[in-house]
């Protein structure tokens, strides 16, 4: 009986070693491991015959079986290592770069002056404690006009100023609708800065574009006054231009702020109009459910293109949109 089982072990070892040496993939190698050494594998089937051996024969047969098992495990691990090394070498060969080949030129990109200006503005206001807010560019009449205290007969609704769509909606003419949407969803106090693209039916020339970018800021809290607005604008201008420039506030009119003002900055010997601002009109507060007897707020807005042109001494707004690499490479 022992001789028969030993012959079975020898036959199993020979067939297993032949199969292992001929296997050329890791999945197949794992299947061979299960076939020969698994719980229901061929070695286990042979070992079940040990129960028929005498007490003297079992230790001898058990030792031979362990030798066969260890030999097959060694062969499996050795073959696995060889296959893994071969796979790595094949991958390296496929990914090897010919360093003698001429490289392909990839020109270095640059930040567009409009993007860099917006980023600079947002960095300043985020540093002042403001949260960045955004909204849709296609707006409803309510958010673009009504909620901002702009009545139906206001000039801003004129077809010459606004792009109206067939379904009654429109392309937003300012980023102020973002403020309304934000206030509807948040209770005061709030401080937000809203950048975005806006649209107006302007004739395109050196200083006007039908599509341009705005940034607006809004602060709502108890006890805010015009002095807080002035301090915020002064802090922004100082960081934006790198110095404390002379600033003047001129009385103006905006339907959504009262009082309202235009802000001028003295830059290189000339006064430049840079933004509009004012205290939030009580009607706007009531439109979003805020109590104007409890809360006050201020808002300000400006064109990004104006700041980009001033900071980079650009003489024509159209240069910002014509994708001329000779121009863009300067930044």
From Swiss-Prot:
Assigned EC number: 6.1.1.20
GO MF term list: ATP binding; magnesium ion binding; phenylalanine-tRNA ligase activity; tRNA binding
Keyword flag Metal-binding: yes
CDD domains recorded: PheRS_alpha_core
InterPro entries xref list: aa-tRNA-synth_II, aa-tRNA-synth_II/BPL/LPL, Phe-tRNA-synth_IIc_asu, Phe-tRNA_ligase_II_N, Phe_tRNA_ligase_alpha1_bac, Phenylalanyl-tRNA_Synthase, tRNA-bd_arm
One record GO biological process: phenylalanyl-tRNA aminoacylation
Primary localization class, coarse: cytoplasm
Cofactor note: Binds 2 magnesium ions per tetramer.
Any Pfam family matching the protein: Phe_tRNA-synt_N
Highest taxon, organism lineage: Bacteria
Keyword Zinc: no
Needed cofactors: Mg(2+)
Compartments (UniProt record): Cytoplasm
Parts forming coiled coils: none
Alphabetized UniProt keyword annotations: Aminoacyl-tRNA synthetase, ATP-binding, Cytoplasm, Ligase, Magnesium, Metal-binding, Nucleotide-binding, Protein biosynthesis
Catalytic activity as recorded in UniProt: tRNA(Phe) + L-phenylalanine + ATP = L-phenylalanyl-tRNA(Phe) + AMP + diphosphate + H(+)
Catalytic class of the enzyme: ligase
Binding, Mg(2+): 258
Subunit-level organization: Tetramer of two alpha and two beta subunits.
Family: Belongs to the class-II aminoacyl-tRNA synthetase family. Phe-tRNA synthetase alpha subunit type 1 subfamily.
Protein name: Phenylalanine--tRNA ligase alpha subunit
Gene that produces this protein: pheS
């Amino acid at each position: 009986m022992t001789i028969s089982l030993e012959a079975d072990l020898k036959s199993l070892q020979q067939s297993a070693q032949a199969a292992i040496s001929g296997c050329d993939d890791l999945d197949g190698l794992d299947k061979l491991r299960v076939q020969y050494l698994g719980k229901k594998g061929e070695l286990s089937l042979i070992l079940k015959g040990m129960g028929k051996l005498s007490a003297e024969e079992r230790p001898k047969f058990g030792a031979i079986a362990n030798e066969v098992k260890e030999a097959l495990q060694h062969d499996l691990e050795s073959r696995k290592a060889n296959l893994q090394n071969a796979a790595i070498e094949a991958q390296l060969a496929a990914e090897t770069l010919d360093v003698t080949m001429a490289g392909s030129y990839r020109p270095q990109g640059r930040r567009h002056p409009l993007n860099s200006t917006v980023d600079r503005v947002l960095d300043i206001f985020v540093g002042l404690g403001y949260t960045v807010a955004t909204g849709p560019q296609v707006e409803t009449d309510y958010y673009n006009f009504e909620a901002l205290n702009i009545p139906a007969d206001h000039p801003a609704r004129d077809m010459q100023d606004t792009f109206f769509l067939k379904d009654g909606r429109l392309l937003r003419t300012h980023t102020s609708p973002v403020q309304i949407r934000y206030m509807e969803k948040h209770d005061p106090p709030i401080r937000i800065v809203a950048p975005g693209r806006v649209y107006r039916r302007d004739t395109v020339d050196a200083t006007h574009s039908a599509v341009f970018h705005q940034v607006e800021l809004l602060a709502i809290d108890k006890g805010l006054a015009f002095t807080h607005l002035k301090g915020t604008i002064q802090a922004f201008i100082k960081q934006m231009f790198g110095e404390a420039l002379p600033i003047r506030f001129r009385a103006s009119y905006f339907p959504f702020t009262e009082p309202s003002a235009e802000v001028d900055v003295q830059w290189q010997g000339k006064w430049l109009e840079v933004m509009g601002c004012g205290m939030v009109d009580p009607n706007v507060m009531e439109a979003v459910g805020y109590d104007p007897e409890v809360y006050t707020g201020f808002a300000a807005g400006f064109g990004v293109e104006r700041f980009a042109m001033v900071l980079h001494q650009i003489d024509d707004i159209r240069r910002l949109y014509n994708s001329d690499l000779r121009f863009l490479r300067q930044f």
